[in-house]
From Swiss-Prot:
The keyword Nucleus does not apply. Binds 1 FAD per subunit. It catalyses: an aldehyde + a quinone + H2O = a quinol + a carboxylate + H(+). Keywords: FAD, Flavoprotein, Oxidoreductase. Its cofactor is FAD. Heterotrimer composed of an alpha, a beta and a gamma chain. Its EC number is 1.2.5.2. It is an enzyme of class 1 (oxidoreductase). This is Aldehyde dehydrogenase beta chain. GO terms for molecular function: aldehyde dehydrogenase (quinone) activity.
Length: 19
């Protein structure tokens, strides 16, 4: 999950949207 955050999104909000 954290690996994806470093892939593109920077904030938790972006991570949620990317998921």
């Amino acid at each position: 999950m954290y690996a994806f955050s470093y892939s593109t999104p920077r904030t938790l909000d972006e991570v949620s949207a990317a998921s």
